[in-house]
């Protein structure tokens, strides 16, 4: 493919509105262009990368018997009313009317559509299982699109749906998809973790998220590629190294979610779902009597603890939530933070929000800072974190402004439902007892769910079982964010390329180091002087030889300065660069491996053989 024939509008500077490196490089390297807020055009390079990823997916899904189809993006609102999601999905749903004033939506996901198609066509358990998927643009009216392709209003997604006559059959397909996803993301060159996830608006119970890890850019050996003109990091002057470190740190670490994972086992979970090892403790101290104490001007746990000279771990944090219009009191040990996802899931609530100061005062008779679980109205629902039941003689709010109660003992002074509703902390023991928890940021690239009968129940999707009884179809759902794969790969494979000029100056610039499986082309073939006929002829021969061996080749045939060609090559990020330069008449070309910065001169006749050796090594 001739570079002069492609639309690759590279920029000399990073875009000023980009906050994450993937967004900046996709724009600067000519992969994407924003058409309007949250809506992007995928230019030829991005489209080739996405198509390569689609090929990987199709190959892996074929192995597990998944069949591709295509559903409409424009959906009747009646389907979503049938499932109940038309009203509950929220403001992110694109709603529109046709000329007949009928309601439609632009699909953000397609559970209802696939459920309807199968409901109308499948009548017996003998027709199951079915395993269907599509690759399609989706739509979500994001309030604040940001970070390039990570949070957009239009995005490309692979969504799959499986249909079963029982849960045992669903379990088999769910495991097939889990393994297929691991194979897909491994082939794509991603550093990822499969983690315990939350089903959220999708419904369902068991779910697993696949998160591309986005580590901090502190490891120079990982993030910096040195040109052959620089022997090692030690050769770079200290002040230049400091500039390089500052440049690495200048870009925000992307990743919507925090992951908690074990240092010594396979345990990993979204922070919203993460838990830790818990061991109930036996009470050894005698229980004191309740005593009301004045705590003037103390509104926070740390202020109360300091005023009463107690540790924060001996205090009870009392919060009030409204769950589906009902008040719920939540209790935590004072130095812990509430995990609202855990609380919402435990309550099986559709809506959960913190109560206002006015609602708290109406319920407790006091304002924030003085709330507590003692002497609440009969029938009050109290959900306490499991650590609270280990407390003896704790401090809690007295439900009286400016006062607290000491000597509070769970069981004696209040009754509660005990469950894990706290946010875990780094360094705590993993729930499997192996290793401690560490945190990392991550980008969600895939999510699989066991939906069960969530949609078949609401939409009447039933089959006749072995006993001719009508039973709901059991479903699974499997998504991959195709367009955000591009962002995730660049976040992990962006590199700062450093070189030394003949005058001894150090220069550095960002570029992409694409893994081979997803690079838009395998080889960047550059002719230094397009007016040199010998070089042109050698380039044409090498291009033909490479393509005959199955390499995708991007040939830079532009009449541009060699410096511009090399800069664009670093930006675009193909794994291999072959330069036909001053030694073309001698049949000598230069090979550069992008990942390491290593380069070597070889006879053009040995190019293919040398590339095969080098690519095996790297």
Swiss-Prot record:
Q: Which GO terms describe its molecular function?
A: aminoacyl-tRNA deacylase activity; ATP binding; catalytic activity, acting on a protein; proline-tRNA ligase activity; transferase activity
One Pfam assignment: tRNA-synt_2b
Which GO biological process annotations does it have? Answer: prolyl-tRNA aminoacylation
Q: Which reaction does it catalyse?
A: tRNA(Pro) + L-proline + ATP = L-prolyl-tRNA(Pro) + AMP + diphosphate
**Compartment(s) of residence:** Cytoplasm
One cellular component GO annotation, for this chain's record?
cytosol
Would you say which domain of life the source belongs to? Answer: Bacteria
InterPro entries named in the record: aa-tRNA-synt_IIb, aa-tRNA-synth_II, aa-tRNA-synth_II/BPL/LPL, Anticodon-bd, Anticodon-bd_dom_sf, Pro-tRNA-ligase_IIa, Pro-tRNA-synth_IIa_bac-type, Pro-tRNA-Synthase_IIa_type1
Q: Known EC number(s)?
A: 6.1.1.15
Query: What keywords sit in the KW lines?
Result: Aminoacyl-tRNA synthetase, ATP-binding, Cytoplasm, Ligase, Nucleotide-binding, Protein biosynthesis
- What's in the domain note? Consists of three domains: the N-terminal catalytic domain, the editing domain and the C-terminal anticodon-binding domain.
What is the documented function of this protein? Catalyzes the attachment of proline to tRNA(Pro) in a two-step reaction: proline is first activated by ATP to form Pro-AMP and then transferred to the acceptor end of tRNA(Pro). As ProRS can inadvertently accommodate and process non-cognate amino acids such as alanine and cysteine, to avoid such errors it has two additional distinct editing activities against alanine. One activity is designated as 'pretransfer' editing and involves the tRNA(Pro)-independent hydrolysis of activated Ala-AMP.
Q: Which HAMAP family match?
A: Pro_tRNA_synth_type1
| Oligomeric and partner information | Homodimer.
NCBIfam families found in the cross-reference section:
PRK09194.1 (NF006625), proS_fam_II (TIGR00409)
- Protein family according to the UniProt entry: Belongs to the class-II aminoacyl-tRNA synthetase family. ProS type 1 subfamily.
Q: Protein name, please?
A: Proline--tRNA ligase
Q: Give the organism the record lists.
A: Streptococcus pyogenes serotype M2 (strain MGAS10270)
Its organism's taxonomic lineage begins at: Bacteria, Bacillati, Bacillota, Bacilli, Lactobacillales
């Amino acid at each position: 493919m001739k570079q002069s024939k492609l639309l690759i509008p590279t920029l000399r500077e990073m875009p000023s509105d980009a906050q994450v490196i993937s967004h900046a490089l996709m724009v600067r390297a000519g992969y994407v262009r924003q058409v309007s807020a949250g809506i992007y055009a995928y230019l030829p390079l991005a489209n080739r990368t996405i198509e390569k990823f689609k090929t990987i997916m199709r190959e892996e899904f074929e192995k597990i018997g998944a069949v591709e189809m295509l559903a409409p993006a424009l959906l009747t609102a009646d389907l979503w009313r049938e499932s109940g999601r038309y009203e509950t999905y929220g403001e992110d749903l694109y709603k529109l009317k046709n000329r007949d004033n009928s309601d439609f939506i632009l699909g953000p996901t397609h559970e209802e559509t696939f459920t309807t198609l199968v409901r109308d066509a499948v009548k017996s358990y003998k027709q199951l299982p079915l395993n269907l998927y599509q690759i399609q643009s989706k739509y979500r009216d994001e309030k604040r699109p940001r970070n390039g392709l990570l949070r957009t209003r239009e995005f490309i997604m692979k969504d799959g749906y499986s249909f079963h006559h029982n849960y045992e059959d669903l379990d088999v397909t769910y495991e097939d998809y889990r393994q297929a996803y691991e194979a897909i993301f491994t082939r794509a060159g991603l550093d990822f973790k499969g983690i315990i996830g939350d089903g959220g608006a999708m419904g369902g119970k068991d779910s697993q998220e696949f998160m591309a890890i986005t580590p901090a850019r502190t490891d120079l050996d990982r993030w910096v590629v040195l040109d052959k003109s620089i022997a090692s990091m030690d050769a770079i002057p200290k002040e230049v190294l400091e500039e390089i470190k500052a440049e690495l740190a200048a870009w925000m670490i992307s990743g919507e979610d925090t992951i908690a994972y074990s240092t010594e086992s396979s345990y990993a979970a979204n922070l919203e779902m993460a838990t830790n090892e818990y061991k109930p403790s036996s009470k050894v101290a005698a229980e004191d009597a309740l005593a009301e104490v004045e705590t003037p001007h103390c509104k926070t746990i740390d202020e109360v603890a300091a005023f009463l000279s107690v540790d924060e771990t001996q205090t009870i944090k009392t919060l009030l939530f409204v769950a589906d219009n009902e008040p719920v009191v939540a209790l935590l040990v004072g130095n812990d933070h509430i995990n609202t996802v855990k609380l919402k899931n435990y309550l099986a609530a559709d809506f959960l929000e913190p109560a206002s100061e006015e609602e708290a005062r109406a319920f407790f008779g006091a304002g924030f800072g003085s709330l507590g679980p003692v002497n609440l109205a009969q029938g009050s629902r109290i959900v306490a974190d499991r650590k609270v039941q280990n407390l003896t003689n704790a401090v809690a709010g007295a439900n009286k402004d400016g006062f607290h109660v000491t000597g509070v003992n769970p069981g004696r002074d209040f009754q509660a439902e005990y469950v894990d509703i706290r946010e875990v902390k780094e360094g705590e023991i993993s729930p499997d007892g192996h290793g401690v928890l560490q945190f990392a940021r991550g980008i969600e690239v895939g999510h699989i769910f066991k939906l069960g009968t969530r949609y078949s129940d609401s939409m009447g999707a039933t089959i006749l079982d072995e006993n001719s009884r009508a039973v709901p179809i059991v479903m699974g759902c499997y998504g991959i964010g195709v367009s955000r794969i591009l962002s995730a790969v660049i976040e992990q494979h962006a590199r700062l390329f450093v070189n030394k000029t003949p005058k001894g100056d150090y220069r550095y610039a960002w570029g992409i180091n694409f893994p081979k499986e997803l690079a838009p082309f395998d080889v960047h073939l550059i002719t230094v002087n397009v007016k040199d006929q010998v070089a042109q002829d050698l380039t044409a021969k090498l291009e033909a030889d490479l393509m005959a061996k199955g390499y995708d080749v991007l040939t830079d045939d532009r009449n541009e300065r060699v410096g511009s060609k090399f800069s664009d090559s670093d930006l675009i990020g193909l794994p291999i660069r072959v330069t036909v330069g001053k030694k073309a008449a001698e049949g000598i070309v230069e090979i550069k491996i992008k990942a390491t910065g290593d380069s070597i001169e070889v006879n053009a006749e040995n190019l293919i053989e040398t590339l095969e050796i080098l690519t095996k090594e790297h």
